């Protein structure tokens, strides 16, 4: 199942953090990883400002370039496919990477048709080694409850790429990895079956 309650909450909180927050400065705001998260969110706010006439597909089309620019989508796609990545053909790997980007763009984008913004506080930054850093933050959900959002970012030259987002300990990458594995298992181990299901989800 590709739209479980936990997944919807995860996408909502992560999406609010990326695309709908008003920045509240923290003590480590000058740190490079923090500045990167600020840059991503500032760009997203500009690009994803709600427009009443926009369709879900139009919002997804605006969001997709941001995912491709700021997220390490090739690595994320490979992780989400798990052990099936090695079993997939190069053509299937490329096709899955493309369609899962479309899927995430649609899943995030459709939640912000009328969203006006909530506060997010960026807190401490932790060096994980091997070029990886975790940026800890808290975002306010529409119901007023706070949610912890942790960003795992990977050094990429003179900038960073987002490798994963965790909401209250739930990993975006892990959640989809489990869902996709279930779909593949239910279709006789076929990666192409998952690809076709995702294509239908995004209308391709």
PLM regions with names:
Residues 106-147, 201-204:
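Surface-exposed, charged secondary-structure patches
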Residues 146-174:
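Short beta-strand edge/turn micro-motifs at domain boundaries
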Residues 2-14:
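Bacterial N-terminal signal peptides that target proteins for export
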Residues 13-22:
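Bacterial N-terminal signal peptides
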Residues 85, 102-103, 127-128, 141, ...:
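Solvent-exposed loop/turn segments at secondary-structure junctions
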Residues 23-29:
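Sec/Tat signal peptide C-region and signal peptidase I cleavage site
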Residues 31-108:
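Early exported N-terminus immediately downstream of N-terminal targeting peptides
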Residues 164-204:
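Low-complexity, intrinsically disordered terminal/linker segments enriched in charged
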């Amino acid at each position: 199942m590709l739209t479980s309650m936990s997944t919807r909450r995860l996408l909502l909180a992560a999406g609010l953090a990326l695309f709908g927050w008003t920045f509240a400065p923290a003590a480590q705001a000058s740190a490079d990883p923090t500045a990167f998260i600020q840059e991503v969110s500032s760009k997203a706010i500009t690009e994803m400002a709600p427009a009443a006439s926009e369709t879900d597909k139009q919002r997804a089309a605006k969001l997709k370039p941001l995912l491709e620019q700021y997220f390490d989508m090739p690595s994320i796609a490979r992780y989400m496919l798990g052990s099936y990545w090695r079993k997939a053909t190069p053509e299937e790997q490329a096709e899955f990477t493309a369609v899962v980007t479309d899927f995430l763009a649609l899943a995030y984008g459709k939640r912000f048709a009328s969203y006006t913004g909530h506060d997010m506080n960026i807190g401490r930054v932790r060096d994980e080694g091997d070029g990886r850093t975790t940026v800890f933050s808290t975002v306010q959900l529409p119901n007023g409850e706070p949610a912890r959002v942790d960003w795992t970012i990977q050094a990429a030259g003179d900038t960073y790429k987002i490798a994963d987002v965790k909401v209250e300990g739930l990993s975006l990458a892990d959640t989809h990895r489990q869902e996709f594995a279930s779909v593949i298992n239910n279709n006789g181990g076929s990666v192409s079956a998952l690809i076709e299901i995702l294509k239908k989800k995004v209308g391709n």
